[in-house]
Amino acid sequence: MSIEPGAQITVHPLLPAARFPGQLSEEDFLPLAYRAMYLARIIEDHLVELYHKGYVRGTVALGRGNEATAVGIGMSLRPGKDVTSLLHRDLAAHLLLGSSPYQVFCQYLANGESPTHGREGNVHYGDPRHRRLPMISHLGKMLSLVVGGTWAARRRGEDVFGLAVIGDGGTSTGEFHESLNIASVHNVPVLFVIENNYYAFSTPISAQYRCQLLSDRSKGYGITGQSIDGTDPWLVYSTIQEMFELMRRDPAPAILECFTLRLCGHAVYDKCEYVSKEQMERWMEQDPVPNVRKLLLDRQLADEEDLTAFETAAKAEIQDIAKRALRVRRPEVPTSDWGVYASGVLPKLAPVRTKQVKNGAAVNMALDYILKTDPRAVILGLDVGRYGSAFKTCKGLWERYGGDRVIDMPLGESGILGFALGAAQVGARPVVEFQFADFSTESVTQLALNAATWYFRCGWPMPLLIRLPCGSGLTMGAFHSGEFEGLWARFPGLKVLYPATAQETFEALVAGYYDLNPCLVFEHKLLYWSKSGDIDFDGDLDAVWRPRLYTEGSELTLVAFGAMVHEALAAVSKCGRSVEIWNPFVLQPLRIEPIIDSVRKTGRLLVVQESCRAQGLGDRVIAEVCGEVMGSLRKPPAILSAPDAPVPFAPELEAAFRPNATRIEEMITALLA
């Protein structure tokens, strides 16, 4: 999953190759910094021109005025070793860390040779293979990934730092706090660099925060913080070096606020009317590119002839690169497979066979099996350590494997999940437990828009197992009783499994863990300690990913999820009709072919779901079945679900709310009348 420390990355020949930890002198640094700043500036000038000519679509977010901070960042990091995530205005850092100008042009042109193959545009790229994690537009959401990636690298014994970039506006997000808190609690040496250019799009910092300096927020986490002039590349570079040295001696996060500039609008379409002419004129006087050029001449670190020669060569090369990128073919349009899921050869595992295991014990057995067979595995969540998790499914694991593998995290589901995503990119294999499936809604962005899209836009796996104790029946009310399988099964890129038996639970967790994609396993809480079954796992992971058949029949096909499988079995046992009961088991990507064949045979379909009609997957199952066998149906398909209402608390209300065996039997009788 991760490259070895010290791996070489090709940097454009016009750019410097010197790297930390050997700190450059100011005299050696400034000429190199100017090269990177100037190159970034002229690349963006070309991109703006291509945008106005209609070749670049979407937009162009410019780093004009931010080049000094970006260069200080890029010159401080070791490509392929340190973990980072950059933002809109950090083109110079991207170039210093391995992106070629050609790749940048291809990315903005969204052609067939772009780093994302045209699946993403403009600033949404990176290089996760080399620990440069690509940003998403939801500001703040990449911070926790850098924390997790840095933690995972150091867990492997690597001398690694993290550097996470955020803007002044992004510091208002909850993820900013969650990431800093996790890094502080776990002593992860990540430098949080705040690029403060005084405006978040058009919102001034006076409407963004009240404190004098954003670096003052470090005091609340018990860490260090500084604020510096971000238009001075040497000051940025040398300060980062000093902070890394402090982190080397005492691993802990820190905040560095760089007061930088945005000498243009938020993006190319923004005319920046909200900044006064006088203010913009003052900012232009601080433009770091011409100012560093003048400094080189004043201090005799370069002469006019050398600078002019470099600038002429750079302009010519960038012009040539832009023309070459314009000639590249457009991306191929897929005919079927859009490349949403990563694939690979799955290992053959040791078999597991045991008699009469409770579903909850099957969870514990699966987690123990994972931790025992793979040293990369770590469990993350709330109260999963000494307490053994809310439903005791992690009982004994902390004692057996230690607190560095079964890890209690600070409360904050989005930050925890982002931490896990980053760790998964740097060699760890996290298992995340949400205490209740309901709490997964705290991490919608991380799951649906970061994890689910990762392979599609990066071409790099995101192996991650997420456990969701779900369902009603325990008198817990609306905030602890939801299923949410219908929510998460609607995001391509996620894999979703919903087991009903001990065998299925064990298989789902082990198969989900070894898959190369983010896998969610729903575990119905009511079944944890009320249902038992044998486990007979032969170690074949490929065989796990299939719908499950419980009874064969000729009169009716009944599809049920989770706890409803057991209610359906009870109903069919009582009614004495020939009913075929199926659990799709794999809800995303939904494999429904055997169920379609069953309906083709029986001519009738009943879907039973605990989720309400609006939230469940019953409608989708019926739609897909009808699309294939409409002519074979003897009766219109039916759904039995909970009412479209939150899960009620009182036992009498909850009992009436949940479908049960009696109501299922009544539906079967009606459909077979």
Sequence positions of predicted segments:
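Phosphate/diphosphate-binding glycine-rich loops and adjacent basic-rich segments that engage nucleotide
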Residues: 475-559
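Cofactor-binding active-site loop characterized by glycine-rich and histidine/acidic residues
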Residues: 45-49, 53-186, 204-210, 215, ...
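Thiamine diphosphate
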Residues: 71, 130-323, 385-463, ...
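Glycine/charged-rich beta-loop-alpha catalytic/anionic-binding loops adjacent to active sites
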Residues: 51-55, 121-136, 159-164, 198, ...
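Conserved acidic/glycine
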Residues: 1-69, 75, 258, 263-401, ...
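General beta-strand structural signal in soluble alpha/beta enzymes
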Residues: 62, 84-87, 116-118, 125, ...
